[in-house]
Curated annotation (Swiss-Prot):
This is FAST kinase domain-containing protein 3, mitochondrial. It comes from Bos taurus. One of its GO terms (cellular component) is mitochondrial matrix. Residues 1-57 form a transit peptide. GO terms for biological process: mitochondrial cytochrome c oxidase assembly; mitochondrial RNA processing; positive regulation of mitochondrial translation; regulation of mitochondrial mRNA stability.
């Protein structure tokens, strides 16, 4: 193993920052260069805990350790060392350094200056330890978000001494030391034309072409080249080719996730690598229980980017383990998990219950982007979770200024879609109105229209903004560069206009011009009306024929002059007798049967969606007698006779005055 001699007269350095590192030494076994001489070690170098010392640093000798969020770098189950600044006492060569203790001490530092001062007290170190020190600098500095080290640090003698050995003779370096140093210096320096990086890259390329790199080194090299040259780097194909030839049993969980990230860098090539992906997807099922929250999030993200819809068993298993560790996810990681579950269309009761507890416990500290993603997840899956909705409403009322226009829309829209008013509804919509009054022009036109339309679904009518959205100026903005307005926007405008007539008679502002009004609210995306459940309709139709005597006495899928489509319409004369549907004279009352299948309700509930509740409310205001026939009542009927009795009770109760 190559030893690196360091100059000991290094300058003291101030803290500095970089953008984060990606991975570290994992697979190559590193032997101690010399035995530890315990009696010569400084007292503070020893653990205060009995048992073997385990170091939470990505290093070949310490395979059980990983940094789960980039900030949590203490050994598993043990507290981190307190900071000690008596650096002059540590004047020993590597023969007095126990490797595990070296990494334990290294991981206790929180700034680059401390790391460099610590390493400067050592006369010689193995190349893997030196590379580990560089990597640790990446770990401690990436939390501040800067992408590069300051110039004064890069040019300092301390940093140059640390880098000098790697550039002088890279051929003497171990594989693990080489690729880890290359990775760390790429992140710290970032200049592809750097003489040092060019030397290290050339040596990596040489060993790659000889087939001399192990799995973990290939993974680190691949991610480093993507960082340095972008996903179009030609060498990446050779790395993936060599990884395909390795047995998956030799891959660690971190390696598997890194392979996903390598493939994710070129999603357009996913079809070419599908056989390899299928193998990885299947093998990953056995690794899920060993993944950290960070790795789970990264794996799910890669599955989305690579469009691995056939890997649903893996997605389901990952979601089960997310439930167990949800409190350990960062906001960004949990957001990625939710995006993946939305993409694959997966949800389950246990995840929802755990998410409810998590969101409720963090009510006023939730990240705005995470809040909007949680609400989008509930909206897409039609999950009406009162604990989540109440917590989110409270968060918005207290911290509305933190939410962007798009985040605000994603937060509010599910309340209308799922037909739910939180306990603090008045405060919620007052806060929203104030935001719109002050930031109206910051909302994109379509986002604003969706937001206001959602409010109207739960009878929080945006009267103060109707004049603006019906104005020619707004309609022109809404259309943008297109030659016409899309059908969904026109339908939303039309329903808002109908709402202004039926529910806001005091509104006296501009009307929506006829050319912007649709004839039917049925749209391809079913955003304003849900099509009738055909199988449920067939059952009800049989019962109606038995009850009324003939198919002649009711019509189905009737488009009204008010844009709504009625599932079944029955006409009654003044005496309450049923008329044939072909007769339009002497019609005294129209009965609208709403045959509500499961898709018209929130998931696993009897709570109507906002669009369906609005439709029934409007039909009543238009003079229809609305009769709801929900699927869960039909499913309880055991015979045709029970169905007829049920329909008779619904249609011709004592108060309805109807006859047949």
């Amino acid at each position: 193993m190559a030893l690196v001699t360091l100059r000991r007269n290094l300058y003291h350095l101030s803290d500095f920052r970089i953008h984060g590192a990606l991975a570290a030494l994992k697979t190559q076994q590193v032997n101690h260069v010399h035995k530890t001489v315990k009696e010569h070690l400084c007292p503070w170098f020893w653990s205060q805990h009995p048992g073997p010392i385990r170091v939470r640093f990505h290093h070949a000798h310490c395979k059980k350790f990983h940094s789960e969020n980039g900030n949590d770098l203490h050994p598993v189950g043990e507290p981190g060392f307190s900071q000690v600044h008596n650096w002059d006492r540590f004047e020993h060569s590597v023969k007095n350094v126990d490797e595990q203790m070296f990494y334990r001490k290294l991981n206790s530092f929180t700034s680059s200056g401390e790391i460099l001062r610590f390493v400067s007290t050592l006369e010689t170190l193995p190349d893997t330890m030196m590379a580990g020190a560089l990597h640790r600098i990446c770990e401690v500095e990436r939390k501040d978000g800067d992408q590069r080290l300051p110039k004064e640090i890069l040019e300092s003698s301390a940093f140059q001494a640390l880098c000098d050995r790697f550039g002088r003779d890279p051929s003497d370096l171990s594989n693990a030391g080489l690729v880890t140093a290359f990775q760390a210096l790429t992140l710290l320096c970032g200049d592809p034309q750097s003489h040092l990086l060019m030397n290290l890259e050339a040596e990596c390329q040489h060993r790659l072409e000889r087939g001399g790199l192990d799995v973990h080194s290939l993974c680190i090299l691949g991610e480093t080249l993507i960082k340095l040259h972008g996903p179009g780097c030609s060498t990446l194909d050779l790395i993936i080719y060599q990884l395909q030839g390795e047995s998956l049993e030799t891959f660690t969980p971190e390696d598997i996730v890194t392979v996903y990230r390598l493939l994710q860098a070129s999603p357009e090539k996913a079809d070419q690598q599908q056989r390899f992906l299928n193998k990885i997807n299947h093998f990953s099922l056995s690794l899920v229980s060993n993944l950290s929250p960070k790795l789970m999030s990264q794996m799910l993200t890669a599955l989305v980017v690579l469009d691995q819809t056939q890997a649903l068993p893996l997605v389901i298993k990952l979601s089960k383990y997310v439930v167990r560790h949800i409190a350990r996810f960062t906001s960004e990681e949990l957001r990625k998990v939710l995006e993946a579950l939305i993409y694959f269309g997966h949800s389950d009761r246990f995840f929802t219950e755990t998410l409810e507890q998590h969101v409720a416990s963090l009510c006023l500290t939730l990240d705005p982007e995470l809040v909007s993603r949680v609400m989008e997840y509930c909206s897409r899956k039609l999950i009406l979770s009162e604990p989540i909705f109440n917590a989110v409403a409270e968060t918005f009322v207290c911290q509305a200024e933190k939410f962007s226009p798009s985040q605000t829309a994603k937060l509010i829209e599910p309340f209308g879609k799922l037909n739910y008013l939180p306990p603090n509804a008045s405060a919620l919509f007052r806060k929203l109105e104030n935001m719109l009054l002050t930031r109206f022009n910051h909302f994109p036109p379509k986002t604003l229209l969706r937001l206001l339309h959602s409010c109207s679904l739960i009878e929080s009518h945006p009267v103060n903004f109707m004049a603006k959205i019906f104005s020619p100026y707004f309609l022109q903005q809404l259309q943008g560069a297109e030659s016409y307005l899309d059908r969904l926007s026109l339908a939303q405008l039309t329903q808002l206009f109908l709402t202004s007539i039926l529910e806001c008679p005091f509104y006296k502002g501009p009307k929506l011009l006829p050319k912007f009004q649709v004839k039917s609210f049925l749209t391809p995306c079913s955003s304003l009306e849900t099509p009738m459940d055909f199988h449920l309709y067939k059952s009800v139709m049989i019962g109606l024929i038995d009850l009324l005597g003939a198919r002649l006495y009711f019509s189905s899928k009737v488009l009204t002059p008010y844009c709504y489509t009625i599932d079944v319409e029955i006409k009654l004369d003044e005496d309450g007798f049923v008329l044939p549907f072909t007769i339009d004279e002497d019609v005294h009352k129209r009965v609208a049967l709403c045959i509500d299948g499961p898709k018209r309700f929130c998931l696993n509930s009897k709570h109507l969606l906002g669009k369906e509740a609005t439709k029934q409310r409007h039909l009543r205001l238009l003079g229809y007698q609305v009769v709801q026939i929900p699927y869960y009542e039909i499913e309880m009927l055991k015979s045709r006779l029970e169905l007829v009795d049920y329909l008779q009770g619904k249609l011709f109760s004592q108060n309805s005055g109807g006859h047949w």
